[in-house]
Every structure is written in C-alpha cells, then in structure tokens.
Amino acid sequence: MAMNYNAKDEVDGGPPCPPGGTAKTRRPDNTAFKQQRLPAWQPILTAGTVLPTFFIIGLIFIPIGIGIFVTSNNIREIEIDYTGTDPSSPCNKCLSPNVTPCVCTINFTLEQSFEGNVFMYYGLSNFYQNHRRYVKSRDDGQLNGDPSALLNPSKECEPYRRNEDKPIAPCGAIANSMFNDTLELFQVGNASDLTPIPLKKKGIAWWTDKNVKFRNPPGTDPLEERFKGTTKPVNWVKPVYMLDSDEDNNGFINEDFIVWMRTAALPTFRKLYRLIERKNDLHPTLPAGRYYLNITYNYPVHSFDGRKRMILSTISWMGGKNPFLGIAYITIGSISFLLGVVLLVINHKYRNSSNTADITI
C-alpha cells in the first residue's frame, strides 16, 4: 500500500501518533554532542602571536639545518661508475655476451683519507624494484624456513615458482634478479704493488632480517640435504645452499641475499655490499692515494638502460651523506624568518596608519 509523503510530518518529527501509541521522531537527542553545543576553543591570530612563531621557527630551523649540512659535507664519499657504456671504459668489453666471465679493473685516486669505518655499496639506476608485481614476487613463508612452503611455493612467485618440475628456492622475481657482481679493492703501493683491502661480508644486513625474517629449513642435516627436492633460481649460477662456505652466512641467511631482498622504493638506489673496519686509531682506514677496483662483471643492466656504480662512504650520527635534509631545514627556516620580517613591517606600517586615523577622526 502506498504511503503519502508529507514534508510537514518530517519537520514535525513524523506523522501524528495514533491513539494509545508512542510518538516516533527523528529529532536528535537534546544533548550537547548531538545538538552541536560542545564548548570550542578557536585561537585568535594576532600580530603578537603570529610574528614570534615565525621568528622562533626560523631561529630553530636555520641552526639545525646548518649543523646537518656541515655534518653531511664532512662525510667522505666517492662513486665509481663501472657500467662500461663509454668505449674508453675498461669494462666496455664486458657488454659483449661472448665474454664470460669478464673481469675489468678501474683505477681511481682518493684525494682525502677516509677515517673510521668505511662502507662499500653497489648502486643501480633505472631499476624499478618498486613495481607492484615485482615487490609481491616472493614467498615469505619459504624464506622463513617453512618446509611446506619450501616444496610448494606461493603462486605470487610465478613465473619463477617452478623450474624443471621442481620448486625454486628461493622463488620469485626478486630473488631471481639478485645482484651478482664481485667487487674487490686494492691499494696501490709506492712500488706499484697491490695490497688487498679486507672486506667484511657479515654484519651488512638488519638484525631483525638475519635472525627473525630469514631462516633456513629446520633440521640438523647438511644444508644441501635440507634443500633437497628444490632447484636454484633460473638466473643463478649456483644453488642457495652454496652461496658461502660459512654455515652462518649460507642459504636463506646469506647477508648479500638478505640485503637484496629488501626492495628499494626508488629506481636509483644503493645497497650495502661490504664493510671496511678500522683497525688502528693511528692510521686512517683508507689513506689518500691510488686504488684499484677489480670487478667480476656478471650483472647485466645494458638491456634496460641501467647503470652500475660502486660507492665508498663514511657515516656520521645522521647516517650517510645527505645534503638535502640540511638544505630543507635552512630553506624552511629562512622562509619563515623572512615572512616574519615582512609581516612585522606590514604590521608596523598599518598599525601606525590606523592609530593616526583614529586620532584624526
């Protein structure tokens, strides 16, 4: 049965109540919350409150920015591009697919000594690790040592889930594209003799990743037996249980592998490769002078117009070299201070005009 609509009924709270019934109404309860009568506080912006705020922000941000900028500039850093696209580059020969394995050497000079611990990174450009399908192409259960996931990886790993009718360990596009160049550093002596620089490969991964997120399959058997029934990723030269002779750095807990599996947010990124620890407080870790970078060139980047580089860097209390943060603080502080000055002049000018007008009237 149709019902007649009456706007007056809605305004009054509904149709008339039948005799003996209870009135129905849509009117909100008469409370402070539902009737929007809650007490409110609204600041009144005056010159006396706004101007000091601008000046305080400027006086705080500018010194902080200068301190961060100076600290960043004191960090020693050098980048060596070894992509090899330049015909004069020693690594240009490695772009040919017929030269395998390819070893090239780049010599460079440190103009200043590197003090303290030195961090060696590898850097890649135009590599989009943040692609949605790429980021999801992994099986965290398998990487955590789950035996069922080891033999039956997640479908997210497709098309790198199975190969030769065997499950791939580790599966997925991230693991399949793992960086596999080998970098070695040598110091050139006075008689042109080469002194190898010790590169530490443990301690480069996050503690939580090494001890919680990544684990080998459980058991007391040799690692090869625990990975029995699986096969290596398509692009790998050797299986995961042969990544290192050190049992504490082999399999899924290999730190080079763990570092690579932490995907980057931007297409140009760097990842920690090795540590160069300081052993003697009387001598710099890397003295100024000539060095050789020996590269076993395996990782192809030419197909996607990428670039490869090696970075040597020290760190400070704020991390690695990052001048942007200091510049940002200085810029914001300067703009705030300048706005304070401009508003102070405007306030002074028009306040005097207002007072004069009042007197004239």
From Swiss-Prot:
- Residue ranges annotated as Cytoplasmic topological domain: 2-49, 347-361
User: What is the recorded post-translational modification?
Assistant: N-glycosylated; contributes to ATP8A2:TMEM30A flippase complex assembly but not to functional activity.
Transmembrane in keyword set: yes
| Classification via Pfam families | CDC50
Q: Mostly located where? A: membrane
According to the record, glycans are attached at 180, 190, 294
The GO cellular component terms are: apical plasma membrane; endoplasmic reticulum; Golgi apparatus; phospholipid-translocating ATPase complex; photoreceptor inner segment; photoreceptor outer segment; plasma membrane; transport vesicle membrane
Q: Please give the start and end residues of each transmembrane region.
A: 50-70, 326-346
Q: In which tissues is it expressed?
A: Expressed in photoreceptor cells; detected in retina outer segment and other retinal layers (at protein level).
| Superkingdom in the source lineage | Eukaryota
Modified sites of kind N-acetylalanine = 2
> Residue ranges of region Required for ATPase and aminophospholipid flippase activity?
2-48
What does the entry's free-text domain comment contain?
Answer: The N-terminal domain seems to play a role in the reaction cycle of the catalytic subunit such as ATP8A2.
What biological function has been recorded for the protein in this entry? Accessory component of a P4-ATPase flippase complex which catalyzes the hydrolysis of ATP coupled to the transport of aminophospholipids from the outer to the inner leaflet of various membranes and ensures the maintenance of asymmetric distribution of phospholipids. Phospholipid translocation also seems to be implicated in vesicle formation and in uptake of lipid signaling molecules. The beta subunit may assist in binding of the phospholipid substrate. Required for the proper folding, assembly and ER to Golgi exit of the ATP8A2:TMEM30A flippase complex.
Stored PANTHER family = CELL CYCLE CONTROL PROTEIN 50, CELL CYCLE CONTROL PROTEIN 50A
Q: What is this protein called?
A: Cell cycle control protein 50A
What lineage is this protein's organism placed in? Eukaryota, Metazoa, Chordata, Craniata, Vertebrata
